UniProtKB/Swiss-Prot annotation:
Pathway: Amino-acid biosynthesis; L-isoleucine biosynthesis; L-isoleucine from 2-oxobutanoate: step 1/4; Amino-acid biosynthesis; L-valine biosynthesis; L-valine from pyruvate: step 1/4. It catalyses: 2 pyruvate + H(+) = (2S)-2-acetolactate + CO2. Keywords: Amino-acid biosynthesis, Branched-chain amino acid biosynthesis, Transferase. This is Acetolactate synthase small subunit.
């Protein structure tokens, strides 16, 4: 089962390595990781999209993550109302004669062309993973040279009451 787990951590060298080591040790496949600064100086947010077997595995993983010294908060936001986004850059084979056609394909996705060369264009698209996958499928017939994706980043929408199913543990 796919889970979205967010962590706030002290921004220090080696923190990400120790955290990913826990996933490796327990044989969990990490689909994506995003890391960035937060509104608080010296604190970063990490968003993991990870595959686990069941609820017990999620609880065990959450407990193990919270034992890490530099981890401030761990939240499994999978079942919450969340805002999630991913960015993809897609380099597509494009002769000048096909550019208008490709622009017609990317427009409904609110994607944009961010680079043009003689034989290719680079398309930028943001949104949920399924939206990005759909655009990639439509662009495949033209020939995709490269794809770079950021991975999912997410957090809970607005102010939410904590449901009993939310797995939020904070150690500060």
């Amino acid at each position: 089962m796919k889970r979205i787990i967010t962590l706030t951590v002290v921004n220090r060298s080696g923190v990400l390595n120790r955290i990913t080591g826990l996933f490796t040790k327990r044989h969990y496949n990490i689909e994506s990781i995003t890391v960035g600064h937060t509104e608080t100086a010296g604190v970063s947010r990490i968003t993991f999209v990870v595959h686990v077997e069941g609820e017990n595995d999620v609880e065990q993983l959450t407990k193990q993550l919270n034992k890490q010294i530099d981890v401030l908060k761990v939240t499994d936001i999978t079942n919450q109302s969340i805002v999630q986004r991913e960015l993809a850059l897609i380099k597509v084979v494009s002769a000048p004669s096909t550019r208008t056609e490709i622009n017609g394909i990317i427009e409904p996705f609110r994607a944009s062309v961010v680079d043009v060369s003689r034989d290719s264009i680079v398309v930028q698209v943001t949104g949920e993973s399924n939206k990005i996958e759909a655009l990639i499928e439509l662009l495949k017939p033209y020939g995709i040279k490269e794809i770079a994706r950021t991975g999912t980043t997410a957090f809970a929408r607005g102010t939410q009451q904590k449901a009993s199913s939310n797995k939020t543990i904070s150690i500060v």
